[in-house]
Each structure stands twice: as structure tokens, then as C-alpha cells.
């Protein structure tokens, strides 16, 4: 699943990030360092929208995926529609407040009319920027559920096209129509508006499980995914506080040019963040599925692959910036920067920290996929507030060059702190390990019956009664037999069987053949058998019996594999 879901994701992340930082790139070339500074002052506002977008999307999408894996489709759709409603409501309220209180917002960001040209450019940039942020919020909410349904590829393509369109429209508005910085924010607005509309239409007309309904989850069912989502997205609000403090420190230590340099470093960080986040976001649905299946072996394997991948990419891009720093000139056009070596130095120090940042972001996504909101919040808090701000304040005592070392120091210290906290929490955890049997094998009669014997012995040994053991064996034999009949010679099957405290059994089956629901055989051959046909199809009849004896049965073609989930309850 790593190669199918994750391998190409950094390319999409790089494309998205270049579009996201396109405003700074374009105004740097077209206007100058003052324009970069004007755009840079809005970094906290971008972080606020990111905080809301990921807080309202990720936690709910993970709960949606878990409910689907448990066969609870109606409850899952209620979660989806509840968070869609909350997201759309938020996307109306926030820009309305920003537009009503523009002067107050600019003052809060550290701008005043005394800043002259920078203030005027920032004021023209604001309206389309906040409108675009609202539609970006809606797009992210819808796309998070699409990734957790079965549309990872479409979601990545849509967001990449949105980013490229943003860049293209901004180029036209800035260089052809001479709209200045406002033209860049207009490109951000119109591209995200289109992406939100396309996302909604895709959900309406696609063959996935998602659908818009006027049926919502009760408040108590919404609170947990809210906590889970905002535990991670709190990094953006913490980041906004961190950015404000960093900007004020740079203003006191140096001048507006230092803020422009900081914005360049922040834009470089967006490339790394998007790259690492795309690895985390595309792997998160798979982590969530493995977690629901209690498949620790595959979950740990996927984590190792993603971790190695993140470290390799972080090191490679850091080496590129260090050996060939002129790439920063090509991106941002720094002709009016008094000393380009200041930017190169800051970028090199940030690059060292980015390697550890990749590890942190991946750890956040994996912890979130487990539903551990406390663990996620601990890591997020340590990165930005717990270590980030104290280290920044200490380094500011040693001058403007020293403050850039905050990037590697806060990442290393936060990872060390999170490791210590995780060890303490694990030592205090008293819950017993779940009884789980996981296996993967080439589907043939010999392998199947060998695994069935082992699974039956496993279930019986963990207190499952004889009747449930018989139903478990029957269901697996019939389902795998039907898959083998409709598959090719080298069908691979992955099984996960978990025995719960009440001695009920959860079963997850994944196979590698083309899209095929084994229970469609029962409908085609038995329930809808043509009149006059007396011959009984035993595979179809067997699947009917399995359907009768199982609960929470759900089939999905997910991440390129047929996935069946069901439950066998004690009578």
C-alpha cells in the first residue's frame, strides 16, 4: 500500500507548496522585498485557516473511516454531513468578521499606516485572501473524507490542479493586468472556489460511499473527532503565535528586510511541510485501516517506509539548498536584498531542522490515526509553544543570526520530550493487548485450509464458543472460495481476526483481485435466479448463509483492494 498510496505524494506536495507560496515568489520578482514583507504579515491568518481546515476535517475523517471499517455506514455518513455543515458555517463567519474589522486585523498583525507602502499593499491583499481561505477550508474538509473513502488519487490531483491554477491566475493578474499583490490573492480565491465546487460535485456524482444528507450526528458523537482534529491542527494556531513573536523579535533586532527574509524561510518551510504532510495525509487512511484491523505488523511496516522516505527527502533538499543556494534566488528574486548571504545562512539552518520536522509530522499523523488526541496534542504543543517560543526568546539575546537556530533545536527537543511522555503513558496504561490474528497468504486450497485451522484454534483458545468458531470458519471458507473462483492464479489475501472482550469476533478480509463484491454472487445466482432454473448454486447459497450469520457487514473497494468487514456475535 505504500507504493500505491504514498510514493508519489511528495510530488503533489511540492506542486501544492509552490502554488501556496506563489504569492511571495511572484511579488518578489514583480515588485520587491516590501511586497514579500506585506504578504508575510498574513502568515498568521493563513495559519488560522489551516487550523480550522484541518481541525474540522482530519479528526472527523478518521472517525468516519473507523466507522466504515466497523460496518456502521449510517453513523459514518452522519459524521461526514455534520462536519460538512460545521465547515461551511465557519467558512462564512470567519471571512465576514475579517472583512468587517479590516483595520483592527491589520493592526493585530503588526501593521499601521506609518508603514506606508507595505501597509497599503497588505490592505489590498486582504479581501480576496480571506475569501479564498474560506473556500480552501471547505475544499480541505471534503477532500479529507474523499481520501478516507476511496478517492486518494482524485483528491491529490484536484488539490494539485487547484495550486497550479492559483499560480497561473496570479501570474496573469499581476503581470498582465497589473493588479499588484491583490492580483495574487484573487488567484488564491478563484482557484479555491472552483476546487470547492468540483469537490462537492464529485461527491454527488461519484460511486463512492459519501453522500450529502440532512441527517446529522448527535453532539456527543461530534466532540471526540473535534478533539482529535484540533489536537493536531492546534499546531497552526500555535504556529500563528510563534510567527507573531518571531516577527516582532526580528523587527526589534533588525528592520522590515529581516521580516522579508523570515517570510522567505517560512515559504521554504511550506515546501517541506507540504511534502511531509502529503506523505502523512495519504498514508493516514491506511494507518487508520490497519489500526481498525488491529494489524500492528503492517502498521509498523508502513511507518518505517514513510519514516525512511521522509528522512531521505529532507536530507536531499537540505543538501540542495546548501550546495546550490542560488535556487532561492531563482524562486524569490532577491535583487533588492542588501545581503543574500543572510538568506542562505537562515535557509541552511532551517534545512537541518527540516529533517527532524519530517519525523515529527509523520509521528503526528500516525498518532492521530490511532485516535490518540492527547498524544497528538502533546507533540504539537511541545514543537511550537513548549520548546519553540522559549528557545526563540533565549536565542534572541544573541542577535538576529542566532534566532534561526530555533528550527533544529525545537524539533529535536520536542521529539525527545514526546518520546519521554510516550514511555511514561505506556508504562501507566493497564489495558490488556487485544487478541488478534493477522496473516497474509497466496490463495489456494492448501494455504486456505491451513490458515482456517490456525484461525479456528486461535479463536477457540481465546474463549470463542464452538458455534461462533464454526460460523467464523464457514464465513472465511465461503468468502475466500468465492474470491478464488473469480480471481487469477496469484491472488493474495490479507486476514485480520480480532476477539473482543465479549467474545464477539471482528473479521477484516482484503484481496488483490479487481473490484468484486463476493456477496454479489448470492444476489446474482440465488436471490435473482431466473424462473425455471432449479439447479442450486452452492457458492451463492453459502454466501447467503454467511450474510445471515454476520453483523455489520460492509464491502468496500478501498485503496485498490477489495475489503470486507464483518462481525460474528456470541449467541
What are these language model-derived features?
Residues 466-493, 548:
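Conserved ATP-binding N-box helix of the HATPase_c
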Residues 27-47, 116-121, 181-184, 224-228, ...:
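Interfacial/gating helices of multi-pass transporter permease domains
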Residues 505-543:
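Glycine-rich/acidic phosphate-handling loop/turn and adjacent ATP-lid/helix
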Residues 153, 163-197, 325, 384-415:
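Membrane-interface helix-loop junctions in multi-pass transport and translocation proteins
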Residues 93-123, 127, 316-337, 344:
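Short membrane-interface helical motifs at transmembrane helix boundaries
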Residues 1-6, 200-236, 425-439, 533:
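Interhelical loop/hinge segments that connect adjacent transmembrane helices in multipass membrane
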Residues 36-96, 136-154, 262-319, 359-371, ...:
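Small-residue-rich hydrophobic transmembrane alpha-helices
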Residues 114-139, 337-360:
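Alpha-helical transmembrane segments of multi-pass membrane proteins
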Amino acid at each position: 500500500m505504500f507504493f500505491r498510496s504514498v510514493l508519489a505524494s511528495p510530488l503533489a506536495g511540492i506542486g501544492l507548496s509552490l502554488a501556496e507560496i506563489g504569492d511571495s515568489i511572484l511579488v518578489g520578482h514583480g515588485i520587491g522585498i516590501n511586497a514579500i514583507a506585506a504578504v508575510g504579515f498574513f502568515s498568521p491568518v493563513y495559519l488560522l485557516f489551516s487550523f480550522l481546515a484541518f481541525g474540522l476535517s482530519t479528526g472527523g475523517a478518521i472517525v468516519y473511516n473507523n466507522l466504515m471499517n466497523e460496518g456502521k455506514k449510517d453513523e459514518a455518513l452522519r459524521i461526514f454531513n455534520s462536519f460538512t455543515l460545521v465547515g461551511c458555517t465557519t467558512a462564512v463567519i470567519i471571512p465576514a468578521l475579517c472583512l468587517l474589522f479590516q483595520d483592527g486585523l491589520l493592526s493585530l498583525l503588526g501593521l499601521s499606516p506609518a508603514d506606508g507602502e507595505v501597509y497599503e499593499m497588505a490592505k489590498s491583499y486582504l479581501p480576496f485572501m480571506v475569501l479564498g481561505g474560506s473556500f480552501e477550508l471547505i475544499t480541505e474538509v471534503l477532500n479529507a473524507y474523499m481520501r478516507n473513502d476511496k478517492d486518494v488519487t482524485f483528491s491529490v490531483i484536484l488539490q494539485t490542479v487547484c495550486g497550479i491554477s492559483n499560480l497561473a491566475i496570479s501570474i496573469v493578474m499581476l503581470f498582465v493586468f497589473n493588479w499588484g499583490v491583490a492580483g495574487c490573492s484573487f488567484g488564491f480565491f478563484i482557484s479555491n472556489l472552483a476546487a470547492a465546487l468540483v469537490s462537492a460535485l464529485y461527491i454527488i456524482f461519484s460511486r463512492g460511499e459519501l453522500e450529502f444528507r440532512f441527517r446529522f450526528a448527535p453532539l456527543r458523537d461530534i466532540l471526540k473527532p473535534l478533539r482529535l482534529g484540533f489536537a493536531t491542527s492546534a499546531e497552526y494556531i500555535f504556529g500563528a503565535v510563534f510567527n507573531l513573536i518571531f516577527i516582532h523579535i526580528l523587527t526589534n533586532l533588525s528592520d522590515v528586510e529581516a521580516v522579508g527574509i523570515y517570510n522567505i524561510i517560512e515559504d521554504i518551510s511550506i515546501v517541506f511541510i507540504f511534502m511531509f504532510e502529503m506523505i502523512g495525509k495519504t498514508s493516514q487512511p491506511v494507518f487508520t485501516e490497519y489500526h481498525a484491523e488491529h494489524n500492528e505488523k503492517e502498521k509498523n511496516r508502513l511507518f518505517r517506509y514513510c519514516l525512511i522516505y521522509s528522512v531521505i527527502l529532507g536530507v536531499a533538499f537540505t543538501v540542495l539548498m546548501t550546495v546550490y543556494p542560488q535556487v532561492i534566488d531563482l524562486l524569490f528574486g532577491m535583487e533588492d536584498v542588501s545581503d543574500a548571504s543572510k538568506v542562505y545562512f537562515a535557509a541552511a539552518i532551517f534545512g537541518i531542522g527540516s529533517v527532524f520536522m519530517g519525523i515529527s509530522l509523520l509521528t503526528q499523523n500516525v498518532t492521530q490515526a490511532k485516535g490518540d488526541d492527547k498524544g497528538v496534542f502533546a507533540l504539537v504543543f511541545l514543537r511550537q509553544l513548549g520548546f519553540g517560543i522559549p528557545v526563540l526568546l533565549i536565542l534572541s539575546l544573541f542577535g538576529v543570526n542566532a534566532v534561526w537556530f530555533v528550527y533544529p533545536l525545537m524539533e529535536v527537543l520536542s521529539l525527545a520530550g514526546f518520546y519521554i511522555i510516550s514511555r511514561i503513558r505506556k508504562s501507566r496504561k493497564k489495558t490488556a493487548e487485544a487478541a488478534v490474528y493477522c496473516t497474509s497468504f497466496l490463495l489456494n486450497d492448501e494455504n486456505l485450509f491451513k490458515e482456517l485451522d490456525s484461525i479456528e484454534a486461535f479463536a477457540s483458545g481465546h474463549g470463542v464458543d464452538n458455534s461462533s468458531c464454526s460460523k467464523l470458519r464457514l464465513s472465511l471458507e465461503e468468502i475466500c472460495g468465492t474470491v478464488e473462483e473469480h480471481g487469477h492464479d496469484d491472488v493474495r489475501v490479507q486476514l485480520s481476526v480480532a476477539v473482543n472482550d465479549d467474545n464477539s469476533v471482528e473479521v477484516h478480509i482484503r484481496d488483490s483481485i479487481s473490484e468484486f463484491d463476493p456477496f454479489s454472487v448470492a444476489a446474482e445466482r440465488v436471490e435473482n435466479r431466473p424462473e425455471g432454473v432449479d439447479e442450486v448454486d452452492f457458492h451463492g447459497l453459502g454466501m447467503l448463509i454467511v450474510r445471515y450469520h454476520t453483523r455489520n457487514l460492509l464491502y468496500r473497494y478501498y485503496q485498490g483492494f477489495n475489503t470486507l468487514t464483518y462481525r460474528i456475535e456470541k449467541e
